Curated annotation (Swiss-Prot):
Keywords: Cell inner membrane, Cell membrane, Ion channel, Ion transport, Membrane, Transmembrane, Transmembrane helix, Transport
GO cellular component: plasma membrane
Organism: Rhizobium rhizogenes (strain K84 / ATCC BAA-868)
Protein's name in the database: Large-conductance mechanosensitive channel
Listed InterPro entries: Mechanosensitive_channel_CS, MS_channel, MSC/AndL, MscL_channel
Amino acid sequence: MLNEFKAFIAKGNVMDLAVGVIIGGAFGGIVKSLVDDIIMPIVGAIFGGFDFSNYFLGLSSAVNAPTLAGARAQGAVLAYGSFITVLINFLILAWIIFLMVKGVNTLRAQVERKDNKVAEAAPPPADVQLLTEIRDLLAKR
């Protein structure tokens, strides 16, 4: 059983998945920083300097804090500003992944077209040509 587990872990697919998860986690941090530190301040400057992170709706009358952290300490809140930020993170990440997949698919299609052209352009072997000529001559008789 232990040997089977070792063989399973050593498979390329499992290792590729592990690397993908680790890189994906790091990439998620980069996208979060891009949104939080670059995009959201620009959006805030365009729309009058507001900060999405402190946009919330208190679900009880006891919630009256000016910040999300304070409001959460006072009671339940709908933190729609945080949701907007996470949604923007997701859209950016999805767009980047879409562009990457599209690029890979384009490269694959180009390689396949090139392989097909090479296969079509290659002349048949000499013995096949000879047999084809013999067949054509016999067909004319």
